[in-house]
Amino acid sequence: MAAEVILLGFWPSMFGMRTMIALEEKGVKYEYREEDVINNKSPLLLEMNPIHKTIPVLIHNGKPVLESLIQIQYIDEVWSDNNSFLPSDPYHRAQALFWADFIDKKEQLYVCGRKTWATKGEELEAANKEFIEILKTLQCELGEKPYFGGDKFGFVDIVLIGFYSWFPAYQKFGNFSIEPECLKLIAWGKRCMQRESVAKALPDSEKVVGYVLQLKKLYGIE
C-alpha cells in the first residue's frame, strides 16, 4: 500500500519551501494543499497543528509532522534509500545541524528580513546591516564549496535556499544590495536554482515583491 503524503503550505513561506524541496529531492509522491494562512486556515490545518496553527504541516498516513527542520530530517529518515541530506559522519552531521540551527535561531534571518520591509530609519539601517552580517557568516562557512556540505546539495542548502527567493524584495524595500558583499552566496543561490526541486519549490521573486506590497498595505506600513 502506497504511503499517503500531504503537504499543507503557503506559497511565500520559505519554511514550506524547505519541505517541498526535501520531498522533491527524494522523489516522494505527495499532494500539495495551499493554505490561506492570513484569512482562512483550513479545518485540516487546525486539526493537524492545533498548538501553533502554522504551516508547513507534513501529513504522512494521517499523522502530522510539524516544524520544517524536523520535517526535513523525518523525510530523510523515512525515505532513506537514496540521496541522504545529512552526512553519515557524526561530526559533519553535527556541523550541518549547527548551521541549520544558526539560520533559524530565534528566527534571526527571518526577523531581520522582515525588518527590511517593515521598518524605517535607524531601525531599518540596523536591520540591513545585521542581515548582511548573517549572510556573510554563512558565506564564510560556504567558502569555496559548491554547497554547504561540499560537492553535494544537502541539509543546510535546503534550509537556507528559500530565503533566496525573498532577496529581491528585501533589497527593494530595504534599499540595500546583497550581492556586492555576498558574491559567493549569490552564486550558490543561482547554482541551487538549477536543481529541479528548488526551481519547483521557489516562487518567482517578483511575485514575492507583490506579496510584500500586499503585506505592507495590510499592516499599514508606508
Swiss-Prot record:
InterPro entries in the record: Glutathione-S-Trfase_C-like, Glutathione-S-Trfase_C_sf, Glutathione_S-Trfase_N, GST_C, GST_C_Tau, Omega/Tau-like, Thioredoxin-like_sf
GO BP annotation list: glutathione metabolic process; toxin catabolic process
Reaction catalyzed: RX + glutathione = an S-substituted glutathione + a halide anion + H(+)
Record-given protein name: Glutathione S-transferase U21
PROSITE patterns named in the record: GST_CTER (PS50405), GST_NTER (PS50404)
Family: Belongs to the GST superfamily. Tau family.
Species per Swiss-Prot/TrEMBL record: Arabidopsis thaliana
Domain GST N-terminal: 3-83
EC number of this enzyme: 2.5.1.18
Protein's cellular compartments: Cytoplasm, Cytosol
